[in-house]
Amino acid sequence: NYYEMRNIAVSNLMEPGSTFKTASIMVALEDKFITPDYMVDTGNGVVNMHGSNMKDWNWYKGGYGKIDVTRIMEVSSNVGVSSIIDKFYGDNPQKFIDGLKRMSIDKPLNLGFVGEASPRILGPKERYFAKTSLPWMSIGYETMIPPIYMLNFYNAIANNGVMVKPKFVKAIAKDGEIIQEFPTEIVNPKICSDTTLTMIQGILRKVVSQGLAKPAGSKQFSVSGKTGTAQVSQGKAGYKAGGVSYLVSFCGYFPSEAPKYSCMVSIQIPHGPASGGLQAGSVFSRIAERIYAKHLYQDLASAKDSTSIIIPEVKNGDLREASYVLQNLNIQ
């Protein structure tokens, strides 16, 4: 018999990886440093950032070269996102941190679960904040965020910028009578401007329709979201102790034009290869389609039974035999 010892969604502090890039890009959009068509030269997929190499997943193929912000998100370019954040916030990292906090991504939700964890976002005044911290933070490292917080952030994007506290119980009833109700609690009434919201919603939709997150999509409805693939840290032992382990994820919502559901899939892969789009995205797609199918209704008036089908003319033959067959089929 197997059972979960703890609720991973609320207690698992993890480095979110590329799902965090959405927050980074939103901060830069909100500060008006960039637009979706802002161009970045990602070169051959490798760039030295303060003594350490930042790599794109396809660096061995020559990288992506010059691409705009939308394409950066579609292909989840580490070089693209980190170059933007390092360029505009390198001299003032606190401005970037303030932008994240403005969106309430780290605000404690106080959900009431045993072992509930809260996000940890490193600040420039802290002991271990180095020159490399900002660019690596922008792509989802050096930051610890429980899955429920990441999902709540994407849900706010889907909810027109309104961040609400996750609610697991709407009301308590006894003998058919409601004895207690739990109203919706607003965490942040507006995580960003309408302009930024419209831009990031458009970007996240394209990430699925024409980016690496295509496996998360559906032919039945539109999906928006972002993939994530992060190496799992073994604490003081680093990222490669005992072999490289990955956390692949996809966080998004559907249908894109009128969101009803948000969902996050996280899978820990003991060994490579790992792909947030292919592995977590495919699971997301199956979950989304099953949920969507539960709310499909057919108009009874449009449903046809066998007696409503137009019967073709009877071929030439014996009239009595044809009449006998038709009568037994209840066809007049």
Q: At which residue positions do the language-model features occur?
A:
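Generic structural signal of hydrophobic/aromatic residues within well-ordered alpha-helices
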Residues: 84, 96, 200, 321-325, ...
